[in-house]
Amino acid sequence: MVELVITEKRDNPILKRKELKYTLKFENARTPSREEIKEIIAKHEGAQKELIIVESNKQLTGKHEIVGYTKIYQDKASAMLYEPDYELIRNGLKQKEAK
């Protein structure tokens, strides 16, 4: 069972996004992956999974909880404009360039 608790929600109209701080509790389950966290947040907020940038996740020592920060963009163009390349790659919005 996974439970999402939004601890802080802020609209940022200038950057065309919502910013969320959350606690994700997962009793008797493995630690959710970044993709699974995006799916949980998308379902909870009614957003498209592709527009969610999971910036940070910190698992609390000795607990089955993650404290995290994520951004939900209104459109992909805004995410591509405001997010650094490494975040876009990490969240699957951009492919890593081969050297």
Curated annotation (Swiss-Prot):
Belongs to the eukaryotic ribosomal protein eS24 family. Pfam families: Ribosomal_S24e (PF01282). This is Small ribosomal subunit protein eS24. The gene is rps2e. It comes from Thermoplasma volcanium (strain ATCC 51530 / DSM 4299 / JCM 9571 / NBRC 15438 / GSS1). Keywords: Ribonucleoprotein, Ribosomal protein. Signal peptide: none annotated. GO terms for cellular component: ribonucleoprotein complex; ribosome. One of its GO terms (molecular function) is structural constituent of ribosome. One of its GO terms (biological process) is translation.
